[in-house]
Amino acid sequence: MTTVLIVEDEKEIRRFLRIALEGESLRVFDAETLQRGLIEAATRKPDLVILDLGLPDGDGVEFIRDLRQWSAMPIVVLSARSD
């Protein structure tokens, strides 16, 4: 089964994505922080990461750099930033 990790601090966005992805028969895990997201990515090894760039505990670009040190898993980036 294809697995997806959602790294997003907004509960409603996580919920929306989870419902949509599970509706497509994907297995979904989530994390509210970048730190937790890296832990989940390392332990669960998802097929795809959906990442919010603007989380309170850091910069999503740093998450990508950290992840790329040991994985080439695909990442879809989300952002509500206007800058």
Model-inferred region functions:
Residues T33, D59-E62:
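Acidic catalytic/metal-coordinating carboxylates
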Residues I39, V61-M73:
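Short amphipathic alpha-helix used as the core "switch/output" element in two-component signaling
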Residues L5, D30-L48, D66:
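Acidic, metal-coordinating helix/loop segments flanking the phosphotransfer/catalytic sites
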Residues D52, S79:
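Active-site residues of response regulator receiver
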Residues W70, R81-S82:
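Short, conserved "switch-loop" micro-motifs in signal-transduction and mechanochemical regulators
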Residues E10-F29:
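Two-component/phosphorelay signaling modules centered on CheY-like receiver
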Residues P56, D83:
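The feature encodes the CheY-like receiver
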Residues E8, L55:
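Conserved acidic carboxylate
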